[in-house]
């Protein structure tokens, strides 16, 4: 595995050459990444050349449909799943609400779902609301000091009543990467399906969902350098078991069964630009010329290697500061570069102070109220969150550390 060519990477993102953004280092990537040029090019082309109803007989319509199909096929291949096991919806939260409705119709009285208090609300609230329909909700709780999930605690929650286990690949404030394959195996052994929220993990390298093994995997394309779409993998066995949520005449198309809303044609088509970007990085760094899953895995490891190298010095500089509590582990190899800090004063005010030092970051609860409460964080203060990705430069890291020295 070689070293990431950071200049090549940043050249793929027009934001880095945008005059209005010069001098500002972007550290709110967990809220939405910059968009890569292949996605912008495809979106512009669609809106200028293909803005018609797709799948018709005339050229513009035919090409529109082909580009939508291309996006699904290429992204599914990177994720290691079948093409029709990937659906696009308006957002991850919306996709989860649709799934919860399907489970509500499928489950029987007395059935149970396991949720965590480590999740973003998108993979928590929709499931918890099913208690109103008579289903049992069991909470897999984090350690209040570390924020970690203990596998034995999960095993203690499982029995023949549990139909679904929901958890994050990593939390959007705690950052620790959960062992998806191991957790999935435990849940499957107990007869439960598995739903993984990958929103905070996928920006750091698309996972091989097929190898990981969950029945549902969710992430948001606008955080993975793409357009504003929620990407949802539902493996065939579960997708064909759950009741259809779309128009009745679309029930036979697996990728349509859980997307009742009309598809956003242009943004789905533009999602193929994420696959273009993966291929650009793979080929530029002399990666494998094999199938898309192999190329995706190569780029995943390339991204993670870069991020870990940049993240560890940040964690080292923060972890022993007075009046600063690092949320989650200080080991960069075990977490995503999404770093939340509990401070002695209001985090939004600190984020405002950072603007004066050219740092774009955020403060608040980031829809992760449950994990912050469980860890004893004062919600009136919230947390300061600094988050980055593989395209962040060493110069920007230095700028961040200098700014934190000045404001903390």
Language model feature labels by segment:
Residues 1-408:
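Pyridoxal 5′-phosphate
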């Amino acid at each position: 595995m070689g070293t990431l060519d950071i200049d090549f990477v940043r050249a793929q993102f027009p934001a880095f050459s945008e005059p209005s953004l010069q001098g500002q280092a972007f550290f709110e990537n967990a809220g939405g990444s910059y968009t890569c040029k292949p996605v912008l090019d495809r979106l512009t082309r669609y809106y200028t050349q293909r803005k018609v109803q797709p799948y018709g007989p005339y050229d513009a319509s035919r090409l529109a449909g082909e580009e939508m199909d291309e996006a699904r096929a290429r992204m599914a291949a990177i994720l290691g799943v079948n093409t029709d096991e990937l659906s696009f919806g308006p957002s991850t939260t919306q996709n989860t609400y649709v799934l919860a409705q399907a489970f509500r119709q499928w489950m029987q009285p007395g059935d149970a779902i396991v949720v965590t208090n480590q999740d973003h609300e998108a993979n928590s609230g929709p499931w918890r609301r099913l208690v109103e329909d008579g289903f049992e909700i069991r909470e897999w709780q984090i350690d209040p000091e570390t924020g970690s999930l203990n596998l034995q605690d999960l095993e203690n929650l499982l029995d023949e009543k549990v139909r679904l286990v929901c958890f994050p690949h990593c939390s959007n404030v705690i950052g620790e990467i959960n062992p998806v394959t191991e957790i999935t195996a435990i849940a499957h052994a107990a007869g439960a399906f598995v739903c993984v929220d990958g929103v905070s993990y996928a920006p750091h390298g698309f996972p091989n969902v097929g190898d990981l093994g969950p029945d549902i995997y969710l992430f948001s394309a606008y955080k993975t350098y793409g357009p504003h779409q929620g990407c949802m993998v539902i493996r065939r066995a579960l997708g064909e078991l759950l009741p259809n949520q779309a128009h009745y005449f679309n029930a036979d198309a697996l990728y349509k069964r859980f997307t009742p809303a009309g598809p956003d044609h242009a943004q789905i088509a533009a999602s193929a630009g994420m696959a273009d970007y993966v291929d650009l990085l793979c080929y530029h760094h002399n990666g494998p010329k094999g199938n898309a899953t192999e190329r995706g895995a190569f780029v995943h490891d390339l991204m993670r290697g870069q991020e870990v190298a940049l993240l560890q010095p940040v964690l080292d500089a923060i972890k022993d500061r007075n009046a600063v509590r690092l949320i989650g582990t200080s080991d960069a190899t075990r977490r995503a570069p999404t770093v939340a800090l509990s401070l002695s004063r209001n985090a939004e005010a600190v984020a405002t102070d950072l603007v004066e030092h050219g740092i774009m970051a955020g403060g608040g609860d980031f829809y992760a109220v449950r994990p912050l409460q469980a860890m004893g964080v004062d919600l009136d203060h919230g947390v300061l969150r600094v988050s980055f990705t593989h395209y962040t430069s060493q110069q920007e890291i230095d700028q961040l550390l200098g700014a934190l020295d000045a404001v903390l």
